[in-house]
């Protein structure tokens, strides 16, 4: 099944963006070629941009603390797997400690590094990081891959508590939902939300159907409409029934 996810609020939207960026960063950092490490570095700049939202750190700390207080009373409950519970609580407490230790403005260490700041300013220009534009950057790209990885890992380290916190919140949200099999009649589906507040919607479709879901929602109702791509990859509305799995997630 192909999984599509749709955030219901700006906070989850930001966390999904961070998750995607960190996954891309990790992939390219593990590669060998200097061009791949260039992508890792520019992705690091994107992470800092998204993570620099003023209230992101405090939002994550509040959510983790709320979840910790919800789970902590289950300690000693014979109906709960205690090892799993302690692992989750320990992960939360460790991540909260990491967030607490973050000092100053998020990503400020990148702005304070003049060399990185020069690369960042040139990277937004198409073709702006050529060797004649940034000879010192080109020289760094000629160093051993292990050295480049070590440098980039050092630059990402102050942002890792945000990655860990986002991963916990998204995991808890995803695990809260229960998938149900539904049918989009003539490619369209809608459902009343009965006043419940959700943070995330998941849509799973069989790859052989070759359909793409488009979703929208408000606090009363959600809509899912399916399209297919024509020869030019432009979306075209589906007029046949489409089976899919729907999961609504609420923290």
Swiss-Prot record:
It comes from the Bacteria. It is found in: Cytoplasm. This is Cell division protein ZapD. The gene is zapD. InterPro entries: ZapD, ZapD_C, ZapD_sf. Interacts with FtsZ. One of its GO terms (biological process) is division septum assembly. Keywords: Cell cycle, Cell division, Cytoplasm, Septation. Cell division factor that enhances FtsZ-ring assembly. Directly interacts with FtsZ and promotes bundling of FtsZ protofilaments, with a reduction in FtsZ GTPase activity.
């Amino acid at each position: 099944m192909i999984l599509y996810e749709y955030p219901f609020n700006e906070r989850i939207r930001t966390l999904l963006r961070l998750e995607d960026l960190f996954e891309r960063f990790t992939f390219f950092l593990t590669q060998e070629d200097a061009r791949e490490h260039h992508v890792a570095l520019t992705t690091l700049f994107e992470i800092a941009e998204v993570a620099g939202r003023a209230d992101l750190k405090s939002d994550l700390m509040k959510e983790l603390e709320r979840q910790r207080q919800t789970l902590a009373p289950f300690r000693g409950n014979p109906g709960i797997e205690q090892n799993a519970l302690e692992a989750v609580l320990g992960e939360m407490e460790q991540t909260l400690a990491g967030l607490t230790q973050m000092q100053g403005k998020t990503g400020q260490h990148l702005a304070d590094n003049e060399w990185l700041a020069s690369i960042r300013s040139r990277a937004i220009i198409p073709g702006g990081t050529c060797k004649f534009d940034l000879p010192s950057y080109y020289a760094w790209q000629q160093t051993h891959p292990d050295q480049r990885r070590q440098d980039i890992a050092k630059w990402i380290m102050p942002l890792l508590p945000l990655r860990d916190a986002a991963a916990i919140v998204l995991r808890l949200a995803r695990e809260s939902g229960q998938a149900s099999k539904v049918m989009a009649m003539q490619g369209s589906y809608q459902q009343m939300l009965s006043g419940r507040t959700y943070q995330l919607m998941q849509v799973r479709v069989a790859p052989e159907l070759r359909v793409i879901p488009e979703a929208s929602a408000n606090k009363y109702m959600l809509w899912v409409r399916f399209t297919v791509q024509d020869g030019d990859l432009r979306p075209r509305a589906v007029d046949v029934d489409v089976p899919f799995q729907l999961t609504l997630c609420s923290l």
